[in-house]
């Protein structure tokens, strides 16, 4: 079920404070965050976030197309190693 419109989008307070400080100082450095659950709002456009994927931080540059999505959507947590090929048929031929 979607979040109520009356509540508004969720953005972690600490993350929002970091963005406000960056805007006030004019600093465009990477903002490190563990808050994958935060919704991207128009205030975050143009900033680069280092989003934690459980192992390392993935740089995510926020654009207009990302508004309404979550930060965690752009930092995948799982790596897909392709399924093992059919080695027996290659060896027999």
Swiss-Prot record:
RNA-binding found in the keyword field: yes
UniProt cross-references to PROSITE patterns, sorted A to Z: RIBOSOMAL_S19
Keyword annotations of the record: Ribonucleoprotein, Ribosomal protein, RNA-binding, rRNA-binding
One BP annotation, GO: ribosomal small subunit assembly
A GO molecular-function descriptor: structural constituent of ribosome
Record-level GO cellular component terms: cytoplasm; small ribosomal subunit
Any coiled-coil regions, as ranges: none
Role: Protein S19 forms a complex with S13 that binds strongly to the 16S ribosomal RNA.
UniProt similarity note: Belongs to the universal ribosomal protein uS19 family.
Protein name as annotated: Small ribosomal subunit protein uS19
Species of the source: Syntrophus aciditrophicus (strain SB)
Primary gene name: rpsS
